[in-house]
Amino acid sequence: MKSQKLPRCLAAAALLSLTTAIASAQAQTWPAKAVRIVVGFSAGGPTDVVARAFAEHAARALGQPVIVDNKPGANTILAAEAVASAPADGYTLLLAATNHTMIPALYSARVKFDAVRSFAPVCTLAVSPTVLVTGPAMPAKTLGAFMQQVRETPGQRSYGTPGTGSSGHFASEQFLRMTGLSMNHIPYKGAAQVVTDVIGGQLDSSFATLGSVLPQIQAGKLTALAVASSRRSTLLPQVPTFAEAGVKGYSADAWYGLLVPAGTPAPVLQALEKVAVQFTEQAGTVARLQGMGMEAQHTCGQAFGRDMDRDTRAYIKLAGELQLKAE
């Protein structure tokens, strides 16, 4: 019996060695064909725009076509599943956004992948700071005045979001828990009407991504009280961070970044990271993203992975406290 097992073990070891050698050789020659970037949103949105801008740069840098594949549906779960189950060879990428780390908090029973461990993080490409904006219904011009008015009228002031469980909802509730304030949540089906109603006075405030409200701020229709970043936005240098305004430790940037299937060879990850960093440092990229209220910014590899893991845990905890369920 032992004599039969030994050849089998040797054969298995030889097969594993051969498979590893083939994978290594393929990684060294990557890319030898077109690369696909899967996006969980329809064409035209911020995630899609970042993906297409990166695809143009990557195609030039890699010498191969880089194709954007829009796969909207199920709050980006369909796109994430497609990439998580794809071969870990560097030819299928996911352009993910902040909501990717919210999936476990809202859909853990429905998904077939782990939002963190089923993927290898490459780099973030851009961030869009979250900004607290108010309209005519809320005359406060500073974060301190806003907090004082909310404190004096507990439960009477409102904030709007694109929907229950959205990034705006999580950002708002994190702020309220940190400050001990109470406000009414008014969920909408999309961000556009939220902005319209803050401007019109039907809503007091909203925590919105800067890209979605920058034109209205610049036109004086909305007042920006603070940005939820570690430093001031280059697009709104006159607006303080929450820390500068007295709420330390609060951060709610919306990020856009590249993920690949877990197990992707290190040489491929290194090559992708190099291309991603080059992309964020190009003057053309910086200008293009600024035009959409975004900032080119890269956090790569393990640091990106740690940020994702931290955020995922925080969203799971907050969703439990709020008893949130996916709509």
Question: What are the functions of these language-model segments?
Answer:
Residues 11-21:
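Bacterial N-terminal signal peptides
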Residues 32-34, 177-181, 266-327:
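An extracytoplasmic/periplasmic, membrane-proximal ligand-sensing/linker region
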Residues 1-5:
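N-terminal secretory signal peptides that target proteins for export/translocation
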Residues 42-44, 98-99, 127, 135-140, ...:
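Short coil/turn segments
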